[in-house]
Amino acid sequence: MFSLIFLILIGVTAVCDAQELVLHLSFDELNGKVAKDISEFGNDATFKGNPKLIEGVFGKALEFDGKTSGQIPDHASLDIVEAITIEFWAIVGGGEAIQSGVEKGTAWISGLYNLAALYNGGTILQFFDLPDGCNDENIGPSIQDGEWHFLAGTWDGDDILLYIDGKLEADMPCKGELKPNNDPLFIGARGGSGRFLTGALDEIKVYNYALTKDELLKDMAEPVSLRVDAQEKLTTVWARLKAN
């Protein structure tokens, strides 16, 4: 019995310590109202409302009608405390003044991290546990224009960086320490009950470390298989989006 507990503890520690992709929702298919996580951790998202697949940047994407949201149960892989990257492609239309993208927590509590697709006229990556100025002042430009944009935020333990379409748009020194919480991770709404997204999301990814700009550009170009020729791939992606 002791050996089994010891092995479980080792496994949990490994999940927390290794640099990993801990969530990847491609939205290429739905099984009922469940979107499969294609990372190794199986953090599948269950949606309520009217989840609908549409044409995305890569394959299919999930449309959000201002009433739809997804929920992923708490898991050790999502209790990120040392560094993080959250990224997704998003279309943001009308609707609420604050529209959630990916948020761990049901309310503004310890352990919450949030990459908001729309935040008071802009975009933001925020954390409850970091110093006050880091929570709501590092706001990037708005992407509320009905077009696809690649939004990514990183925190490496010292600085929050916010990228839009591969360009660094906001940065702020934010040294601190995150704490885990036991809440689910929500997609497209805070706690599944407010700040609903009106638009669409594609290729949601969460890493438990901070990606470099070059690594983000590779994800933009080809999110499943990262390749060296990222700039060439990006040119093709933007040409296809403009053609549509």
Can you describe what each PLM-predicted range is?
Residues 1-3:
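Classical eukaryotic N-terminal signal peptides for Sec-dependent ER targeting/secretion
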Residues 5-67, 217-244:
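Extracytoplasmic low-complexity segments
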Residues 22, 26, 31, 35, ...:
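Extracellular glycan-recognition modules
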Residues 73-76, 138-142, 174-175:
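Beta-strand-rich interaction surfaces with strong enrichment in secreted/lumenal proteins
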Residues 163-169:
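Short strand-turn-strand beta-turns centered on an Asx-Gly dipeptide
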Residues 172-200:
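Flexible glycan-contacting loops in extracellular carbohydrate-active proteins
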